[in-house]
Structure formats: C-alpha cells, structure tokens
Amino acid sequence: MFNLLLVVVGGGIGAGIRHLTNMGALRLVGPNYPWGTMAINIVGSFAMGLFIAILARRGGSNEVRLFVATGIFGGFTTFSAFSLDFATLWERGATLPAFGYALASVIGAIIALFLGLWLARSLP
C-alpha cells in the first residue's frame, strides 16, 4: 500500500508540473502547435534516462524508483516510460521487437484515440 501511495503522490506532482509546463507554453508560443506536449515528452524522456542511469550506477531503493520514475515522470509524461521500454528492448539486442513496440504503440494509440472519438460522437 505504501508503494501505491508513493506512485500516487509522485504522479500528482508530475501531472501538476505537466499542467504548468503546458500553460507556460501556451502563453509563450500560442495554441497553434503542441509545443508544450512535445517539450514534456522530450524533457521527460531525457530525465527518465538520466535518472535510471544514475539509479543503476549508484543504486537506489525501489521506493525511490517508484516515486520518481513511475510517479513523477509517469505523471509528467507517459512518453518517458515508453522511451525507457524502447531503450530496454534495444539494449537487450531486441532491435526488431523495439521498433515493433514503438510502431505498434504510436499507431495503436492514435487509432484508439480516433476510435474513442468516433464512439463518443456516435452516442446519442
């Protein structure tokens, strides 16, 4: 139960940072392109890589990993988890599965979003 609490609290922090980042991007560059989301995905992926590498080198508790990686970075951007999964497959030498994962995740998510839009718009 404590581990879940760590993820929930970290996720709330990450989501709050994501919201503030998006609002800042809207004020700076306007709403015509998703600059905030793109920045969040890139920065979150960089931060995840940095954190995981430091954790692997110096060691760290599962609780710290859950709070920071799953919680904060997961709340900030799930793209960081996606990027870490891709990198893990790649570093294991599973190149084809890594690209299959990336392709299926991105295309599958976009198709699922359009299906959700279609379904919601079809409801009376």
Curated annotation (Swiss-Prot):
<keyword id="KW-0915">Sodium</keyword>
<dbReference type="InterPro" id="IPR003691">
    <property type="entry name" value="FluC"/>
</dbReference>
<comment type="function">
    <text>Fluoride-specific ion channel. Important for reducing fluoride concentration in the cell, thus reducing its toxicity.</text>
</comment>
<feature type="transmembrane region" description="Helical">
    <location>
        <begin position="1"/>
        <end position="21"/>
    </location>
</feature>
<dbReference type="GO" id="GO:0062054">
    <property type="term" value="F:fluoride channel activity"/>
</dbReference>
<keyword id="KW-0997">Cell inner membrane</keyword>
<feature type="binding site">
    <location>
        <position position="77"/>
    </location>
    <ligand>
        <name>Na(+)</name>
    </ligand>
</feature>
<dbReference type="GO" id="GO:0005886">
    <property type="term" value="C:plasma membrane"/>
</dbReference>
<keyword id="KW-0406">Ion transport</keyword>
<feature type="transmembrane region" description="Helical">
    <location>
        <begin position="35"/>
        <end position="55"/>
    </location>
</feature>
<keyword id="KW-0813">Transport</keyword>
<keyword id="KW-1133">Transmembrane helix</keyword>
<keyword id="KW-1003">Cell membrane</keyword>
<feature type="transmembrane region" description="Helical">
    <location>
        <begin position="66"/>
        <end position="86"/>
    </location>
</feature>
<comment type="similarity">
    <text>Belongs to the fluoride channel Fluc/FEX (TC 1.A.43) family.</text>
</comment>
<protein>
    <recommendedName>
        <fullName>Fluoride-specific ion channel FluC</fullName>
    </recommendedName>
</protein>
<keyword id="KW-0479">Metal-binding</keyword>
<keyword id="KW-0407">Ion channel</keyword>
<dbReference type="GO" id="GO:0140114">
    <property type="term" value="P:cellular detoxification of fluoride"/>
</dbReference>
<keyword id="KW-0812">Transmembrane</keyword>
<feature type="binding site">
    <location>
        <position position="74"/>
    </location>
    <ligand>
        <name>Na(+)</name>
    </ligand>
</feature>
<keyword id="KW-0472">Membrane</keyword>
<dbReference type="Pfam" id="PF02537">
    <property type="entry name" value="CRCB"/>
</dbReference>
<dbReference type="GO" id="GO:0046872">
    <property type="term" value="F:metal ion binding"/>
</dbReference>
<feature type="transmembrane region" description="Helical">
    <location>
        <begin position="99"/>
        <end position="119"/>
    </location>
</feature>
